[in-house]
From Swiss-Prot:
InterPro entries: POLR3C_WHD, RNA_pol_III_RPC82-rel_HTH, RNA_pol_III_Rpc82_C, RPC3, WH-like_DNA-bd_sf. Component of the RNA polymerase III (Pol III) complex consisting of 17 subunits. It is found in: Cytoplasm; Nucleus. Keywords: Cytoplasm, DNA-directed RNA polymerase, Nucleus, Phosphoprotein, Transcription, Zinc. It comes from Saccharomyces cerevisiae (strain ATCC 204508 / S288c) (Baker's yeast). Present with 2520 molecules/cell in log phase SD medium. One of its GO terms (cellular component) is nucleus. This is DNA-directed RNA polymerase III subunit RPC3. Residues 429-444 have a biased composition (Acidic residues). One of its GO terms (biological process) is termination of RNA polymerase III transcription. Residues 381-401, 422-448 are annotated as: Disordered. The modification Phosphothreonine is found at residue 27.
C-alpha cells in the first residue's frame, strides 16, 4: 500500500499548470492591502490559524500559513513572490518547520514538459493539535491506566508534550537520553499503552498528502484500468472505478492505525514493545472522540439526569476507541456532493455503527467498568404513585356491596362470610407486599446490578434524543450518525437563547418545525406580541439563523405584490456560528499577544533567573500591580478560550 501511496505522490497531473495560472489571478495586494480589522473579519479561518501559528512558530511561519489559507496551494517560488521580506532559503526553512509539525501538506506534480514542482497546502489537523495541545495532555493523563499515579502521569505528560513539540519521534531517540534500565522499561511500557489506546500512531506519507489529490489519483487509476473495449456503459465504468477506489482509499487511511505495524515482541523479555525505529505522532481523531463523548455526556446530563449520564459515560468510554471517526475522510473528497452518494454514505454509516464488533454492549459489560463510588440504588422509582391510587380504589370498590349473582333457575348465590373474605384479602395483600419487598431487596443487594443498569439503558434508549439504540433485547449501541445532528441543534439553540434570549430560540424552533412560514403563521403559533416578533426576527436574520424567501404572487415582481416567507437553513446557520466562534477565539489570542507586546519589558524583567521568586523584593509596587494585571487577564483569556472551544468543536464535528 505504500507503493500505491508513493505513486499518488509522484503522479503526473496534466492540469497542474492551468491551476497555477488560475491562482495567479489573485495578487498579493488583494489580500495584504486589506486593513487588519477587515481581513480578520472576512476570513475567520485565516485569522485563527495565523494567530495560532504566530504564537508557536513566529511571524514568518504565520505569514506562510496565511498565504496558504488565503490563496490555496502554492509553490516555494510563488510564496517568495507573494510574501515581502522572505527569500527562498527562509521560505524553505519555514516550510520544513511547518511540515514537521504537520501544519503543511505537500504534493509533487510533473508538468507536460517534465518539470517537477512541489506544491504546499495548509493542514488544519496540525494546527488543531497546536490549539488543543494542553487539553490533549490532560485528556491522555486522565485516561491512562497507571500504577504509580504521580510519577507515571508525569512521564506520560513529558512523552506527549515531546511528541506534540517535535511533530513525531521514535522510541529509540526518546530512550537515548535515559540511563536507568528500570526507567527505560517503564517508559517503554507507557509507549505501548499509548499506542494500544490509539493516542499514538505511526506517521506515514498519508499525513503529508492532500486527501483530495489522493482520492483523485485512485479514482483515475481504476477508471483507466478498465479496458476501452469493455461493453460497460460510461456510467457503470465510473461506478465500478468509484467502488474500487473506495476500497483502496479505506486501506490507505486505516493502515497507520494497525497495531501490527507498530508493536512487536521483545525476544529478551517476551513483552510487547514499540518498534524502536517507528516514528510516532499524535492521533488527533482519537482525542476528538473523547471530546465528542464529553459533549454527549453533558447533553445526557441535561436530558435524563446525572446518574443515568454516568452510566452513559461508561458506555461511551467502553466503545470510544472503536467508534466511527469524527469526520470520515470520504467527506473531504467532494464525493458526497452527489445526492445518491450522500444517502448511501449515511446508510452505510448507520450499518457500521450497528454491526462493527466492539460497538455493542449490554448491562453486564457496563457492570464490570462502573466505579465503586457510583451507587445506583435509589436512583429509580420502584413504584409509580398511581399504583397506590389504583390499589386504594380497588380496595374501596371491594368494600362496597357486591352485585348478587343468580343461577339459571333463579337461585341466589350467597356471599362469602365476612371472616373468610377478610382473610382472603389480607393474604392477597401480604403476597403483593412480599413480592414488592423481594424486588426492592434484589435491587438493594448490589449497587451495580444488571437490572438497575438495564433500567438506565432503557431510559437512554427511550429518550426523545437517540442516545442509544437497542438492536436486540438487552443489547445497545450508540447511533452517532443520528445523535450528532441533534447535539449540534441543541448547542446551537443554547447559544441563541443565551445571546439573543429565549424568545429568539422559540421563534427559531417555530420556523424550523414549520419549514417555510409566513409572518401571519408565526404570529398565531409563537404566542408573542407582533412587535416583539419583528424585532426578534430582525436579530435572527442578522445572525443568519433565519433566511427570507420572496414568493411572487403574480407576474409582477414588485415587492408590494410578493409574499415574504421565513425559513431556517441549518447548514448556513451552523457555518455562520462556527465562523463567529472561530473569530472570537482568534480575537482572544490576538489580544493576549498584544498584551504581552505592550508589557514585554516588564515580562522580560520578571522572567529573569535572578528575579524569579524574588519579585516582591526586586520589583516596584507599580510593576507588581501591572504584572498581576497581566497574569489575571491572561488567565481570563484562557478561561474564555476554553468555553469558546467547547462550543466551536461541536460545529467542527461532522
Amino acid at each position: 500500500m505504500d507503493e500505491l501511496l508513493g505513486e499518488a505522490l509522484s503522479a503526473e497531473n496534466q492540469t497542474g499548470e492551468s491551476t497555477v495560472e488560475s491562482e495567479k489571478l489573485v495578487t498579493p495586494e488583494d489580500v495584504m492591502t486589506i486593513s487588519s480589522l477587515e481581513q480578520r473579519t472576512l476570513n475567520p479561518d485565516l485569522f485563527l490559524y495565523k494567530e495560532l501559528v504566530k504564537a508557536h512558530l513566529g511571524e514568518r511561519a504565520a505569514s506562510v500559513i496565511g498565504m496558504l489559507v488565503a490563496l490555496g496551494r502554492l509553490s516555494v517560488r510563488e510564496l517568495v513572490e507573494k510574501i515581502d521580506g522572505m527569500d527562498v532559503d527562509s521560505v524553505k526553512t519555514t516550510l520544513v518547520s511547518l511540515t514537521q509539525l504537520r501544519c503543511v501538506k505537500y504534493l509533487q506534480e510533473t508538468a507536460i514538459s517534465g518539470k517537477k514542482t512541489t506544491y504546499y497546502y495548509y493542514n488544519e489537523e496540525g494546527i488543531h493539535i497546536l490549539l488543543y495541545s494542553g487539553l490533549i495532555i490532560d485528556e491522555i493523563i486522565t485516561q491512562m491506566r497507571v500504577n504509580d499515579e504521580e510519577e507515571h502521569k508525569q512521564l506520560v505528560a513529558e512523552i506527549v508534550q515531546n511528541v506534540i513539540s517535535l511533530g513525531s519521534l521514535t522510541v529509540e531517540d526518546y530512550l537515548s537520553s535515559v540511563t536507568s534500565d528500570s526507567m527505560k522499561y517503564t517508559i517503554s511500557s507507557l509507549f505501548v499503552q499509548l499506542c494500544e489506546m490509539g493516542y499514538l500512531i505511526q506517521i506515514s506519507k498519508l499525513h503529508y498528502t492532500p486527501i483530495e489529490d489522493l482520492w483523485q489519483f485512485l479514482y483515475e487509476k481504476h477508471y483507466k484500468n478498465i479496458p476501452r473495449n469493455s461493453p460497460l456503459s460510461d456510467l457503470k465504468k465510473r461506478s465500478q472505478a468509484k467502488m474500487n477506489a473506495k476500497t483502496d482509499f479505506a486501506k490507505i487511511i486505516n493502515k497507520p492505525n494497525e497495531l501490527s505495524q507498530i508493536l512487536t515482541v521483545d525476544p529478551k523479555t517476551s513483552l510487547r514493545i514499540v518498534k524502536p525505529t517507528v516514528s510516532l505522532t499524535i492521533n488527533l481523531d482519537r482525542f476528538m472522540k473523547g471530546r465528542r463523548s464529553k459533549q454527549l455526556i453533558n447533553l445526557a446530563k441535561t436530558r435524563v439526569g446525572s446518574v443515568t449520564a454516568q452510566v452513559y459515560k461508561i458506555a461511551l468510554r467502553l466503545t470510544e476507541q472503536k467508534s466511527p471517526k469524527i469526520r470520515d475522510p470520504l467527506t473531504q473528497t467532494g464525493l458526497l456532493q452527489d445526492l445518491e452518494e450522500a444517502k448511501s454514505f449515511q446508510d452505510e454509516a448507520e450499518l457500521v455503527e450497528e454491526k462493527t464488533p466492539g460497538l455493542t454492549f449490554n448491562a453486564i459489560d457496563l457492570a464490570r467498568h462502573l466505579p465503586a463510588e457510583l451507587d445506583l440504588r435509589g436512583s429509580l422509582l420502584s413504584r409509580k404513585p398511581s399504583d397506590n391510587k389504583k390499589r386504594s380504589g380497588s380496595n374501596a370498590a371491594a368494600s362496597l356491596p357486591s352485585k348478587k349473582l343468580k343461577t339459571e333457575d333463579g337461585f341466589v348465590i350467597p356471599a362469602l362470610p365476612a371472616a373468610v373474605s377478610k382473610s382472603l384479602q389480607e393474604s392477597g395483600d401480604t403476597q403483593e407486599e412480599d413480592e414488592e419487598e423481594e424486588d426492592l431487596d434484589a435491587d438493594t443487594e448490589d449497587p451495580h446490578s444488571a437490572s438497575l443498569i438495564n433500567s438506565h439503558l432503557k431510559i437512554l434508549a427511550s429518550s426523545n434524543f437517540p442516545f442509544l439504540n437497542e438492536t436486540k433485547p438487552g443489547v445497545y449501541y450508540v447511533p452517532y450518525s443520528k445523535l450528532m445532528p441533534v447535539l449540534k441543534s441543541s448547542v446551537y439553540e443554547y447559544v441563541i437563547a443565551s445571546t439573543l434570549g429565549p424568545s429568539a430560540m422559540r421563534l427559531s424552533r417555530c420556523i424550523r418545525d414549520n419549514k417555510l412560514v409566513s409572518e401571519k403563521i408565526i404570529n398565531s403559533t409563537a404566542l408573542m406580541k407582533e412587535k416583539d416578533i419583528r424585532s426578534t426576527l430582525a436579530s435572527l436574520i442578522r445572525y443568519n439563523s433565519v433566511e427570507i424567501q420572496e414568493v411572487p404572487r403574480t407576474a409582477d415582481r414588485s415587492a408590494s405584490r410578493a409574499v415574504f416567507l421565513f425559513r431556517c437553513k441549518e447548514t448556513h446557520s451552523y457555518n455562520f456560528m462556527r465562523q463567529n466562534l472561530e473569530w472570537n477565539m482568534a480575537n482572544l489570542l490576538f489580544k493576549k499577544e498584544k498584551l504581552k507586546q505592550e508589557n514585554s519589558t516588564l515580562l522580560k524583567k520578571a522572567n529573569r533567573d535572578d528575579v524569579k521568586g524574588r519579585e516582591n523584593e526586586l520589583l516596584l509596587p507599580s510593576e507588581l500591580n501591572q504584572l498581576k494585571m497581566v497574569n489575571e487577564r491572561e488567565l481570563n483569556v484562557f478561561a474564555r478560550l476554553s468555553r469558546l472551544l467547547s462550543l466551536w468543536e461541536v460545529f467542527q464535528m461532522a
